[in-house]
Amino acid sequence: MVVFSKVTAAVFGLATIASAAPAPPTRKGFTVQQQARPAQKKQVNLPAMYAHALTKFGGSVPESVKVAASKGSAVTTPEAGDVEYLTPVNVGGTVMNLDFDTGSADLWVFSGELPASETSGHSVYKPGRTASKLPGGSWQISYGDGSSASGDVYKDTVVVGGVTAHGQAVEAAAQISSQFLQDKNNDGLLGLAFSSLNTVQPQPQTTFFDTVKSSLDRPLFAVTLKHNAPGSFDFGYIDHSKYTGEIAYTDVDNSQGFWSFTADGYSIGGGQSSGSSISGIADTGTTLLLLDDNVVSDFYQHVEGAQNSDEYGGYVFPCSAKVPSFTTIIGGYKAVTPGKLINYGPVTDGSSTCYGGIQSSGGVGQNIFGDIFLKSQFVVFDSEGPRLGFAAQA
């Protein structure tokens, strides 16, 4: 999530981040599989989702998007067959379904500090005998779409895929806005960005990955997200059965705490490469693919009937339109995002107008390679370097 405040604690003149301890012994690695959760018949406000993605990284929200979000002009209900994919995590003895988010560095959860009316349907974290409250510790997040959450911080035992982190910072929500209450299946978030991005005050805390990576065979994790199927997160090793060809690696700039990289160019529908570099963040916590205005405009010139709609707060097009693929060029590798993923779905129930999965990155200042991009890729997040690796999914 967005950096709300970066707090640095100096010890002997060096910036530090409070760390937890993994449980011995060293092991090669582990896999956590997402689980399908039946989708509730809930409405999705598409412009609000877009605004949330922009403000997550400190960007400004265009007025047309704000108006569309407030009017609910593009509100749709997922189809009955849709499913949601979350990952089970044992937090202090309670199994919770969390979003794994490479665009943030906080582990925050619904907790018993919230009113009972706000936790109905959720697994709730209640600090027990393994927990200790972090003295003076607090956290707070807020977004331009009005959503916010805040609370206290505990050190507790967290288990993911059989690997245990003792003394892991757990951010217990004591206040949460209505936007976060709509998804009854999701009990919180586990951040996988760099620990420098952690928002705990007065001292940032380490992420789960940074806590356990010394116990892994290799200090990396690999992400395989799927379209309409559960994905997986592999920690400590690379599963060669999950990709084809060679993995193309590129350097990461983590100066802002994100998995930021630069692609060499792009092409549309298999056409000629633009040759224009694209810098952006690999973010499993953002649904859309957010790109520079000129790239987005170029793409939708290839979609018949596409327009940047003030009414719907983004690019829309006839649902019957043929949507080309979008190819991101990384070294000698071509990462292809199929057109079927870019057609996000009808703007409202039963509408013949569809919302685009590629939208403008606006005032963010960099591009966001969200799930629309990631669901066709096998991606290695390697903390040594650091670097990112990309290959086509098997």
Curated annotation (Swiss-Prot):
CDD domains the record matches: Aspergillopepsin_like
Domain spans labelled Peptidase A1: 85-391
Cellular component GO terms, alphabetical: extracellular region
Reaction(s) catalysed (UniProt annotation): Hydrolysis of proteins with broad specificity. Generally favors hydrophobic residues in P1 and P1', but also accepts Lys in P1, which leads to activation of trypsinogen. Does not clot milk
InterPro entries: Aspartic_peptidase_A1, Aspartic_peptidase_AS, Aspergillopepsin-like_cat_dom, PEPTIDASE_A1, Peptidase_aspartic_dom_sf
Highest taxon in the source lineage: Eukaryota
Disulfide bridges in this chain: C319-C354
Pfam families xrefs: Asp
Record-level Gene Ontology MF annotations: aspartic-type endopeptidase activity
Propeptide residues according to the Swiss-Prot or TrEMBL record: 21-69
Keywords: Aspartyl protease, Disulfide bond, Hydrolase, Protease, Secreted, Signal, Zymogen
This protein's record includes keyword Signal: yes
Statement: the UniProt record of this protein carries the keyword Protease: yes
GO biological process: proteolysis
The enzyme's E.C. designation: 3.4.23.18
UniProt-annotated location(s): Secreted
Transmembrane segments: none
Active-site positions on this chain: D101, D283
Family per similarity comment: Belongs to the peptidase A1 family.
Function according to Swiss-Prot or TrEMBL: Secreted aspartic endopeptidase that allows assimilation of proteinaceous substrates. The scissile peptide bond is attacked by a nucleophilic water molecule activated by two aspartic residues in the active site. Shows a broad primary substrate specificity. Favors hydrophobic residues at the P1 and P1' positions, but also accepts a lysine residue in the P1 position, leading to the activation of trypsinogen and chymotrypsinogen A.
Quaternary structure, from the entry: Monomer.
This protein's name: Aspergillopepsin-1
Source organism (scientific name): Aspergillus clavatus (strain ATCC 1007 / CBS 513.65 / DSM 816 / NCTC 3887 / NRRL 1 / QM 1276 / 107)
Gene: pepA
